[in-house]
């Protein structure tokens, strides 16, 4: 990974995002700290009388300079942008290996993640890491959720394959758990006489999905322990539960931004909104 974009503002969550990016960036990586400012709108008009844009820009410049100076990391480059924070981050993310954002996490998952995080998740094609939960440390143990959606031949067009390959590239990873969860209400409830046999078949099919994705992802990096987890339950719930003991959860998304995948995909959005650990959404 050579380019990591981080959204920076005055929140504690933003500071956690920047620290997370520094922990996972190789020594030769560029960490682009983006701080966006804009003139607030009041009733549809710029509050030109009460707010001086030059003062806003000066304050934003000073803030960003102080943040980078306090860190003292030569890999961090400050970028000041004027405009909508989400759009500014999407533009800065061009060619990046990932975008890292902090999530404030209040109320109903902060009403679908918060406007900036939600915008970036839906409009960039780059992997997005949402820093949430109580653990912001190095991602030593990573859970990668996989499914059988995508290309039949297991090529890189399969979102799960891309997600696993991305996890392989993450600096400092020691253990990766590849998880596939399945849920068939009628089978799980034992409605059919053959429910027991059907569940065994579903378990075997889940194990095959995991093997299929792992084969397509190619060789894993040396020094990384790989485990397979076939779980009974809805994918979102299973991954959220797994996040309790994980440092990072990685999910693939079939969306390409905008309305190409409504609300990003139910599992990706559910995990990003409710995980107990940071979440990476990989396109």
Model-derived features: where do they sit?
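Active-site-adjacent scaffolding segments
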Residues: 82-131
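Protein-protein interaction modules outside structured cores
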Residues: 205-208, 227-241, 245-283
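Glycine-rich, Arg-bearing micro-motifs that act as flexible, cationic patches
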Residues: 101-119, 138-139, 151, 251-274
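General small-molecule cofactor/ligand-binding pocket signal
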Residues: 32-34, 77-81, 129, 177-179, ...
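Small/aliphatic-rich secondary-structure junction motif
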Residues: 1-50, 141-196, 215, 219-221, ...
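A short acidic, glycine-rich active-site loop
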Residues: 50-62, 196-208
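Flexible loop/hinge segments that line or gate small-molecule binding clefts
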Residues: 132-138
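Structural beta-alpha unit
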Residues: 3, 13, 51-54, 69-99, ...
């Amino acid at each position: 990974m050579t380019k990591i974009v981080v959204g920076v503002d005055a929140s504690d969550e933003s500071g956690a995002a920047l620290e997370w990016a520094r922990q996972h960036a190789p020594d030769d990586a560029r960490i682009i700290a983006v701080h966006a400012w804009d003139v607030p709108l009041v009733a549809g008009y710029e509050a030109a009388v009460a707010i001086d844009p030059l003062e806003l820009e000066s304050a934003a410049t000073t803030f960003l300079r102080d943040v980078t100076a306090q860190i003292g990391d030569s890999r961090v480059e400050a970028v000041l942008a004027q405009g909508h924070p989400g759009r500014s981050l999407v533009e800065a993310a061009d060619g990046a290996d990932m975008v890292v954002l902090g999530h404030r996490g209040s109320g109903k998952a902060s009403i679908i993640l918060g406007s900036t995080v939600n915008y970036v998740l839906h409009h960039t094609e780059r992997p997005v890491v949402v820093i949430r939960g109580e653990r912001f440390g190095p991602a030593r143990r990573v859970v990668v959720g996989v499914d059988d959606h995508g290309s039949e031949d297991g090529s890189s067009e399969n979102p799960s394959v891309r997600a696993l390959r991305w996890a392989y590239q993450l600096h400092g990873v020691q253990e990766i758990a590849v998880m596939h969860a399945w849920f068939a209400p009628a089978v799980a409830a034992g409605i059919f006489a053959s429910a027991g046999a059907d569940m065994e078949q579903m378990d075997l099919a889940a194990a095959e999905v995991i093997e299929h994705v792992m084969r397509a992802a190619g060789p894993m990096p040396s020094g990384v322990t790989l485990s397979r987890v076939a779980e009974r339950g809805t994918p979102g719930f299973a991954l959220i539960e797994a996040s309790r003991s994980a440092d990072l959860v990685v999910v693939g998304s079939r969306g390409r931004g905008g309305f190409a995948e409504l609300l990003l995909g139910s599992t990706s959005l559910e995990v990003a909104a409710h995980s107990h650990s940071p979440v990476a959404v990989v396109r």
